[in-house]
A protein has these predicted regions:
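TPR alpha-solenoid repeat register
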Residues: 24, 31, 58-60, 94, ...
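Structural marker of alpha-solenoid helical repeat scaffolds
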Residues: 17, 51-53, 87, 120-122, ...
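Terminal, low-structured helical/coil segments at or just beyond the last alpha-helical repeat
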Residues: 118-171
Length: 171
């Protein structure tokens, strides 16, 4: 807690020194969001995006999307992730986050398309393999489900996703 307090003080000091420092606001927003202070985090992302000179607005949009999803505002999460992808359509991390969100929303075909794009752009991650496995399970393709499971256990045996697989916790 003492480290969090010091980190927050440093973020606030950086923003006081340069109110237009969008990178500091983006980082502070993520800091707040990961501590459950979603509304404050979303406000920092909004402040970062109000700067017309911000070189990487897609980062703040993607982070705002993830923060909104953590908050439970799936519509806002989707809107921000899609805005981020408009600016950087080949960002594998944002594609994967949107795929996960669309899976949660029951949009299985779009999830499949987004995962396919992700696979074209980046090597598999524990997160992408786990999502693929759960998607194929919902679609009823046991062969693909097993293939994802094998890759997950082989490539990422110590991951949280592999532990979930081994314990049968698919949801």
């Amino acid at each position: 807690l003492a480290e969090d307090k010091l980190a927050e003080e440093n973020f606030r000091r950086a923003i006081e020194l340069d109110r237009s420092d969008s990178e500091a606001r983006n980082n502070f927003g993520w800091f707040l969001c990961t501590r459950g202070r979603y509304d404050e985090g979303l406000e920092q992302f909004s402040a970062a995006l109000r700067n017309p000179l911000y070189a990487r607005p897609e980062d703040a949009m993607a982070n705002a999307g993830q923060c909104a999803e953590r908050k439970g505002d799936l519509a806002l999460a989707e809107a921000n992730l899609r805005k981020s992808l408009k600016l950087q359509p080949d960002n594998p991390n944002t594609l994967l986050k949107l795929a996960g969100l669309r899976f949660r929303q029951g949009q299985l075909m779009e999830t499949q398309q987004l995962l396919g794009r992700h696979a074209e752009l980046a090597p598999p991650t524990a997160e992408s393999l786990w999502l693929g496995l759960r998607l194929e399970r919902k679609l009823g393709d046991r062969v693909q489900e097993a293939a994802y499971g094998l890759q997950l256990r082989k490539r990422f045996p110590d991951s949280n996703e592999a532990r979930l697989l081994l314990s049968g916790q698919y949801e």
